[in-house]
Amino acid sequence: MAKAKFERTKPHCNIGTIGHVDHGKTTLTAAITAVLAARVAGNTATDFANIDKAPEERERGITISTAHVEYETEKRHYAHVDCPGHADYVKNMITGAAQMDGAILVVAATDGVMAQTKEHILLSRQVGVPYIIVFLNKCDMVDDPELIELVEMEVTEQLEEYGFNDCPIIQGSALKALEDPNGPWGDKIMELMDTVDSYIPDPQRDTDKPFLMPVEDVFTITGRGTVATGRVERGTLHLNDELEILGVKEDVQKTVVTGIEMFRKQLDEAQAGDNIGALLRGINRDQIVRGQVLAKPGTVTCHHKFTAQVYVLTKDEGGRHTPFFNNYRPQFYFRTTDVTGVCELPAGTEMCMPGDNVEMTIELIHPVAMEQGLTFAIREGGRTVGSGRVATVIE
């Protein structure tokens, strides 16, 4: 029999499991693949052991263990991330190694909300995970429906505290579904996936977002003008489009694209992922520098001061050997450039140890084009000592 060709006919969506240790995240991940393999064409089951011994990956020098599985429902194709350890989650969410369009929060009905349940909800809010669906696991072990109701209320309250309102809750048992994918507990997994299909909207594709390109290099073509090169981060660019040049300098400059080139060929349009050179009308070589961005007018703003969720690398990951204190002044590497800034630790936090994850306020000496969720590295003398994501923009 000929091999079936992979047809990307369905919308794609990135999701993941979050929640307290031993509440059943990995079992649920395995159960989803097992139930879908039994009920929806085009799926294969991934067993618990393969997800649990997740391979280590290095993302920006940080060691993270993450398991990636894929599966599809009738409606969508999914990439699903699951992390074995709590520290892996924290790193994963802060480095943006796994961008999630939505998350399944696993809460054991036997335990209710625990420390990491809260921490993962907070992290989801900080890094901009837009949707959370709750899977109340181990319901087969709780006989009293009133107890389950109490746990549901507790989870809802916790989610609302961080601005996640009206999150759907599905009751089930991942282990039971894994044992019998076609049974009634398997139905609960299908109910979960139907909810994921309907509650998380189709993600906007990168090409549909407003154009943005970080400038990597600038040079002059004699007789033609100034060219900025870089990789298009999102959106599409057409000849004669108006653009703004922002960041690093205080003022915003306007220009028009009079030429687009890729691999020495002229293009009419460039889109997300392309490495291009853009010829900019009326801009001198010294008016634009690496680290600025080209963006569709009015879509991006520059800021000096913001709060961020930061993970500080351990000594083993090549980070600092010693803690840092308030008013620490490292470099912040955004997209293509380093900017010096000052860290203000939260009230009551005296210092930040290697391996910590902390929310801090940062003030940069130059403005940077930013929005919530933008990732950056913290560097000292060229080596990465931390990783962060913008949580809120202040000024």
From Swiss-Prot:
UniProt-listed CDD domains: EF_Tu, EFTU_II, EFTU_III
GO molecular function: GTP binding; GTPase activity; translation elongation factor activity
Protein name per its UniProtKB record: Elongation factor Tu
Subcellular location: Cytoplasm
Region G5, residue ranges: 173-175
Swiss-Prot/TrEMBL catalytic activity: GTP + H2O = GDP + phosphate + H(+)
Quaternary structure and interacting proteins, as annotated: Monomer.
Binding-site residues, Mg(2+): T26
Pfam families in the record: GTP_EFTU, GTP_EFTU_D2, GTP_EFTU_D3
EC number: 3.6.5.3
Spans annotated as G2: 61-65
Gene3D superfamilies: P-loop containing nucleotide triphosphate hydrolases, Translation factors
HAMAP family xrefs: EF_Tu_B
Family membership noted in the UniProt record: Belongs to the TRAFAC class translation factor GTPase superfamily. Classic translation factor GTPase family. EF-Tu/EF-1A subfamily.
Segments for region (G1): 19-26
Alphabetical list of InterPro entries matching this protein: EF-Tu_GTP-bd (IPR041709), EF-Tu_GTPase (IPR050055), EFTu-like_2 (IPR004161), EFTU_2 (IPR033720), G_TR_CS (IPR031157), P-loop_NTPase (IPR027417), Small_GTP-bd (IPR005225), T_Tr_GTP-bd_dom (IPR000795)
Record function comment: GTP hydrolase that promotes the GTP-dependent binding of aminoacyl-tRNA to the A-site of ribosomes during protein biosynthesis.
Chain's gene name: tuf
The entry's keywords: Cytoplasm, Elongation factor, GTP-binding, Hydrolase, Magnesium, Metal-binding, Nucleotide-binding, Protein biosynthesis
Binding site for GTP: 19-26, 82-86, 137-140
Domain tr-type G, first and last residues per copy: 10-204
Region named G3: 82-85
Region (G4) location: 137-140
Main subcellular location of this protein, as a coarse class: cytoplasm
GO cellular component, one term: cytosol
Cross-referenced SUPFAM superfamilies: EF-Tu/eEF-1alpha/eIF2-gamma C-terminal domain, P-loop containing nucleoside triphosphate hydrolases, Translation proteins
